[in-house]
């Protein structure tokens, strides 16, 4: 090769490397630039350690007021991206009465401090009925194939260009789980769950900010992205809405939300169950009703017996929900001791008319058909309580939302996604909501399709990356 050409080529390569490194360094900022509006002194680390993405490692219980990094085990020692750092912490928030309560959450982050944090993922877990399935318990006995396991994968160390990885992941337990497991969970009480989850996010950021020097900075242009499936899908959307409507979107760099098969419209969900007279996940109905009876101002004057048949209540299902010892499948199995389940091509189900009293079933049947109903406080209050938690009403999002839904979801019908898309998008901003409707797969299989991909990237990962890249990548995103 010509010496002059070789020399110029070396200079060009050196200059290119210098520019790339310069851009890499300058395109970062310190976490101290993030304004959360909360005091880190009110939060506490109660457990921390390093866990492998390949195997469960030994817990390292500690206490602190920051994500401390002076532990030698808090660094990748098994190769690029094989470990993540976790922290279980408590933080203050409020309940439906405006009283201060202390909740738990889990934070996960890369062990490689040389690559900047790309984004912050607010991971919202799906419907659970047992405390062992909470995010903070995942570090002890969780299965990586669950939604929590998949959300934690965003903390995996990879190249800085992989915007779906190298993330700080915050996973709230929700009220009624973790250290409040003996309290009722406000199931589908969207605003309060969103408030509590966003508080977990804010305190998680503050704990990271107070860590010692050496921890990774965050990329310039980072986003907070709310992600979840099933109940987690609706909580993700509710958190998105809460940040927008409470002026937290700028400080927290809200990017948008990625929502899979979520019950955004409780009326649409109830309509499906009553019209078909089929409930494929029977525990969902008492979860919804119990949450409203415990926390909704419309419903506090009523009792469970006002809505459920005596036979259904005698199964002990409300006790199972309160104890939080049995998971959803355990409860489904326990109900078989009292009921003979029916079956169609989508799976096993109980009739809605076997769960609701005849009066409630008749009222709901008329209401969803638009037929006149007699005035009755306990029925009218039920409908009002369902409607007040409808995320698709009275809100036009300013930030992107990706909806994923199975057209044949037997638990959370496609009407939820259609309601969100039709009511929340506008002609002025038609691309603010994008969606993928898959042709097959019930609620469980749809969740696998959302988080997993045999080849290439999953729907969830592609949507996270589209939002993380900003307006240009979102506009190019064609799900």
State each model region's role.
Residues 28-114:
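Catalytic-loop region of hydrolases
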Residues 96-104, 108-162:
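Short, surface-exposed "cap/lid" segments of acyl-processing enzymes
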Residues 260-394:
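Accessory cap/linker subdomain of secreted extracellular hydrolases
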């Amino acid at each position: 090769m010509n010496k002059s050409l070789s020399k110029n080529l070396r200079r060009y390569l050196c200059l290119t490397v210098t520019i790339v490194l310069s851009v890499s360094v300058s395109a970062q900022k310190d976490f101290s630039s993030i304004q959360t509006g909360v005091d880190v002194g009110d939060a506490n680390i109660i457990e921390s350690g390093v866990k492998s993405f390949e195997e469960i490692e030994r817990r390292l219980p500690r206490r602190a007021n920051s994500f401390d990094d002076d532990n030698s085990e808090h660094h990748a020692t098994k190769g690029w991206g094989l470990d993540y750092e976790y922290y279980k912490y408590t933080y203050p928030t409020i309940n439906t009465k405006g009283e201060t309560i202390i909740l738990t959450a889990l934070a996960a982050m890369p062990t490689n401090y040389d690559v900047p944090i790309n984004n912050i993922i607010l991971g919202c877990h799906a419907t659970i009925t047992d405390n062992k399935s909470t995010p903070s318990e995942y570090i002890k006995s969780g299965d990586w194939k669950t939604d929590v396991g998949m959300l934690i994968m965003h903390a995996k160390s990879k190249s800085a260009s992989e915007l779906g990885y190298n993330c700080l992941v915050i996973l709230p337990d929700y009220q009624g789980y973790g250290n409040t497991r003996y309290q009722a969970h406000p199931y589908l009480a969207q605003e309060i769950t969103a408030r509590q989850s966003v508080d977990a996010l804010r305190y998680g950021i503050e704990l990271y900010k107070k860590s010692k020097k050496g921890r990774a900075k965050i990329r310039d242009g980072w986003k907070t992205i709310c992600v979840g499936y099933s109940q987690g899908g609706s909580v993700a959307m509710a958190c998105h809405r809460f940040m927008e409507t409470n002026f937290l979107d700028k400080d927290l760099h809200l990017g948008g939300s990625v929502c899979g098969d979520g019950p955004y419209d409780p009326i649409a969900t109830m309509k499906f169950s009553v019209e078909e007279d089929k409930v494929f996940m029977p525990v969902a109905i008492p979860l919804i009703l119990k949450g409203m009876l415990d926390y909704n101002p419309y419903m506090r004057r009523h009792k469970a017996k006002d809505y459920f048949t005596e036979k259904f209540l005698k199964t002990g299902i409300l006790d199972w929900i309160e104890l939080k010892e049995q998971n959803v499948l355990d409860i489904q199995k326990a109900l078989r001791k009292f009921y003979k389940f029916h079956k169609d091509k989508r799976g096993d189900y109980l009739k809605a008319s076997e769960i609701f009293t005849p009066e409630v079933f008749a009222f709901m049947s008329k209401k969803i058909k638009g037929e006149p109903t007699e005035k009755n406080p306990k029925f009218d209050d039920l409908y009002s309580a369902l409607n007040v938690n409808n995320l698709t009403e009275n809100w036009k999002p300013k930030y992107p939302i990706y909806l994923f839904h199975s057209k044949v979801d037997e638990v959370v019908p496609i009407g939820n996604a259609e309601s969100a898309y039709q009511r929340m998008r506008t002609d002025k901003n038609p691309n603010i909501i994008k969606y993928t409707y898959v042709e097959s797969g019930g609620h469980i299989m749809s969740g696998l399709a959302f988080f997993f991909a045999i080849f290439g990237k999953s729907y969830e990962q592609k949507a996270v990356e589209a939002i993380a890249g900003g307006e240009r990548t979102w506009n190019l995103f064609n799900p």
